[in-house]
Amino acid sequence: MIEVRNLTKKYRELTVIDNFSHTFHEGKVYGVMGENGAGKSTLFRCIAGIELYDGTVIVSEDRQIGYMGDTPFYYSYVTGMEHIEFCLRAKGKDVGRDEIERLNDKFALPLGRYASRYSMGMKKRLMLLTLMLQDNDIIIMDEPFNGIDLAGTIILRQWLKEMKAKGKCVILSSHIVSAISDICDEITYIHKGKVVADFSGMSAESIEHYILEEFLSPVP
């Protein structure tokens, strides 16, 4: 479980996250939506402990957080396999290459090649493969559906359902309403750093209509 209390993030005079509070429970998938610049990525980095912030984030004891950012980054001369092994060692996970290769059968990544030379779609799949192998208790994913193909989307959706069934806590963001509306237990909408709407239990069509009417309508 993660309990967030009054989380605020400012860059000088600019308030990016404004007094955000929420409790994220195990065994649930949470969706966060919002326009570009609404504060989703900053919020995720704060909860994951990557950025400093004002407020409180309480993580249940002995729970490991896995974080997948929206922009892949890999060092120039590190292969896909070396990247995975480095990330696993950083988490204290002992996963053999046979297991890595077995899971990679779904992604068909050339793990012997330098990851920095992968296409954008391949880089995203490598991020996802690495996160899957880490077996974290709490999973934070920033725009995981961006840049992946149909097969990757299907694999990701199946995996999210498996994580929920295993009692993991998953927090993700997406602009693709149809990709998350039937997976997420709760969906919140952030506008200018504040939660302004709760779409939990609503259909994808209803969510899209609400967003268009309330937030994306042209200014008269």
Language-model features and meaning:
Residues 2, 17-19:
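Conserved structural motif at the start of ABC-family nucleotide-binding domains
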Residues 33-35:
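The feature captures the beta-strand-to-loop junction immediately N-terminal to the Walker
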Residues 173-175:
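H-loop/switch region of ABC-family ATPase nucleotide-binding domains
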